Amino acid sequence: MKDLVERFLSYVSIDTQSNPSAPQCPSTEKQFNLANQLVSELNELELSDVSIDENGYVMGRLPSNVDYDVPAIGFIAHMDTAPDASGENVKPQIINNYQGDIITLGTSGEELTPSQFPDLLNLIGHDLITTDGTTLLGADNKAGIAEILTAIAVLKANPEIPHGDICVGFTPDEEIGRGANLFDVKKFNAKWAYTIDGGPVGELEYENFNATSADVICHGVNVHPGTAKGKMVNSMNIAAQFQMMMPADETPEGTEGYEGFYHLKSMNAGVAKTELGYIVRDFSREGMAERKAFMQQKVNELNAKLEKGRVELVLTDSYFNMREMVEPHPHVIELAKEAMTACDIQPDIKPIRGGTDGARLSFMGLPCPNIFTGGYNFHGIHEFITINGMKQAVDVIVKIAELNASNNK
């Protein structure tokens, strides 16, 4: 049986960064390098119905080992890594028996310090895997892949552990918001599933943001600066006025918990035309409606002031809070909580201040909460994971499978 850490290190050595500018699926051909390896590993584990489609979605099924009906459940992770930092030539460091000191990340000059990352102080005695300070690690979400496959290997090696059908799925392009777009829920054939894509040990999430993209387009008039008086309209000045109308404290860096925000994420600026790219987030549908109305109101106010419709607002919904689709199936959450408790883990139920494949899948008819991986600081060079936490994730996956069978006997 492949060791959990060995699997993980193998996966992070493969660059699978996704590309939001590419329209195809997967957005980068290199995601197939990991996808094809996972197909081989699923076949080595002798799973049934192993497949990969033209879009890079990998699926397989561990058949039930009991002689009574048990609902099929699934475990899902994504193969791509975030565009925010390089995923090429990842060089992990293993820190055994961490003692609370500063961790030097290779020769990059970067460090993991308890003062900046206080979670480290809760991990004394743990074995950590870090980056070398030049790339992300890829624990998001290759740790989830390693944990799922290791759990499957445990179930295969221990046939005395009862379980129903276990469906496994690995998706491309989650980091650019498309991971569930072409996921074949009918083919997957699970009653419900769990993404293994969370952070610290104990995390259990079934609420996420409602998400909208807001593009503000400001139109100006470009004239030679030497003859511009009374003629030029600088669209960048209009854009600046609009941004100043946004609530200064309702930003990602100023909010937490269930608080929503407006986030100016990008800007393409010129005198004649400036485009502001916002993402807007709120946990309630009502709150999101109010945020959309607020932005439209500010556009209207600015247009009235400018005496011409120089500002446009284009709103596009991205995903919705899965809570409304998961709560009607309380057993899905209760099973995960029961499994964690049986593994001496205190469930830490909190909202996801983001989105997951599970959010989209829940609205596609597959209730799909999110479970921890044991990782921290995703999407950047300070990403790290605890080997202890990874092993606990494996234990929880195995226990969910076991309890699902025993509870339905």
Swiss-Prot record:
Binds 2 Zn(2+) ions per subunit. GO terms for biological process: peptide catabolic process; proteolysis. It catalyses: Release of the N-terminal residue from a tripeptide. InterPro entries: ArgE/DapE_CS (IPR001261), Bact_exopeptidase_dim_dom (IPR036264), Peptidase_M20 (IPR002933), Peptidase_M20_dimer (IPR011650), Peptidase_M20B (IPR010161). Pfam families: M20_dimer, Peptidase_M20. The keyword Metal-binding applies. Its EC number is 3.4.11.4. This is Peptidase T. The lineage of its organism: Bacteria, Pseudomonadati, Pseudomonadota, Gammaproteobacteria, Vibrionales.
